[in-house]
Amino acid sequence: MAAIRRSWLQQRLKGSREPLDSGSRQKVFALKHRSTRDVVEDLRNGDRLITVDDEVDPNLEMAEIQRRVYLRGGPAILFTNVRGCKFPMASNLFASLDQARYLFRDTLERVRRLIEVKLDPSALPKSPMRYAGVPMTALTMLPRFTRSGAVQANQCRLSELPALKSWPMDGGSFVTLPQVLSADPEASSNLMRVNLGMYRVQLAGNEYDPENQVGLHYQIHRGIGVHHRAAMDRNESLQVAITVGGSPAMSLAAVMPLPEGLTELTFAGALSGRRVRMIRGSHAPVYADADFAIVGQVDPTATMPEGPFGDHLGYYSLQHPFPFMKVEHVWHRKDAIWPFTVVGRPPQEDTTFGQLIHELTDPIIPTVIPGVKAVHAVDAAGVHPLLLAIGSERYMPYLKAKEPQELLTQANAILGNGQLSLAKYLWITDDPDDSIRIHDIGSFIQHILRRVDWRRDLHFHTKTTIDTLDYSGTGLNQGSKLVVAATGQSTRELATEIPSGLSLPDGISDPQLVMPGVIAVKGPKFTGDASREDVQRLTAHLEHQPGLESVPLITLCNDSEFAAATLNNWLWLTFTRSNPAIDVDGVGVQVVAKHWGCRGPLIIDARVKPHHAPPLVEDAEVTAKVDARATRGDELAKYL
């Protein structure tokens, strides 16, 4: 039956590579990927997959291949000959936003229309033909129990699973596309209270028993933490299932920031076009259509060292104590394929997740936080370090002199809302003319720089929580935040070249224009607290220099040429390597009624500090090995 279905699927897809026209009538049939093999065959038939039959090592080599193929705009990759492993592996399934749309081409428009109806219920009776498929889509959102599933076809040992290691200093092998499922200990049979998240899983290394234990790294503001707390309060183990593969909708749902009342399983059902089936048992609910499942229990009071791991900020997440699972079962489908991704300094494949998430959630934002029209977590800056927002300024519309008022209320609401609360820098403005494009990052920043008053518009949050993966702060999860809120008319022109009379103190040199109004300068290596005097010398030197009104922002860094080479370079180093409360300074500092401000320019010390995590660097031998592959002239070589 599966062969017949697959043959029919191939005939349907033959020659069809473009996503369905979003304006066309909804199709009755929806592509329902039930396994990674279904996904692979779908991509193959759309000329979006290459197959690598040569042996490839999952220890660093496979990850380097994936990074290169993604950056060169390549297709998905199926590795059929994995060294030391009997399972094929697949990567780059989300190779681009276009490919992600292709995977969900029969359901994405339905999800959009479902969102439209949720935002405006009156749209349904007004346009019944447009929303004719909404009731059926709503039915697919109800997860259901089943007694068994395809994932239970075979058992294997934990050590037989693919041992993917992505970066040289990683503490072992990791699952990089995990679907971590936990049941609410207070309602274990209620699928609407199951949490699905993508929390990294360490399969081997450190002190883990390679056959019986896996590490679980979940951070602050993660749903599984609520279940962990409940299990701890009840003095019982937390039931957890880690699944890999199945419908790609499960992977997207695991990272989707969803509003209250909408669970990951309901969203996955809508996006996959079928109800999510979960296996009922004495264990946590298990996704029945997954390719692999690791099932077990977590002692809520016990931890083990987890990491290091090369993460999406472009640095290593260091070793820290985290929970671990005692493994009871390892299951896999017949003909299972292990999907994986590789994270590192953006852009990587998870960039596509962010793009699709923005596309789906942008219309929802105004309903979540009143007055906020749009938000953009900047991928190039590592996502959480920099958040841009467009709000509204309506408190005193009759006043000619404009200053941020309602924007500050909205900024506080943003920093108190779910995943948005992890933002370290929040730049917010209003847009009464609807002329600002929030995804045009350079233009957005320049819009604020033309209006900002550094004496008034800086609002620090000190000694607070920040993203677990951000090592710019004073400790794990500890640091500060800075809101930059600006409104009104432009008050300055921005320099389009280095001011001719610019003078710098000894040890600080090589000024480079990053973009209009922003300069990067090279400073001495940061060696300790004494190095903070470099910033004081710089501010004192600039105190009485004329011609700096058009340069409101200066970044002090280790390599100003690198910082100015691309906007992405500047975004990455400026916002990942600075802790606002410590590393933000300026010319003409004043503190009035405990409010810190400066005349300007504002200076951000984005030099590498001794407490920062090391950046991700490829292994030279592996790089040479992959370089050699690039000379073979095969289908893969052109992307290497």
Label each region the model flagged.
Residues 8-13, 25-309, 313-324, 328-640:
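Extended, highly charged
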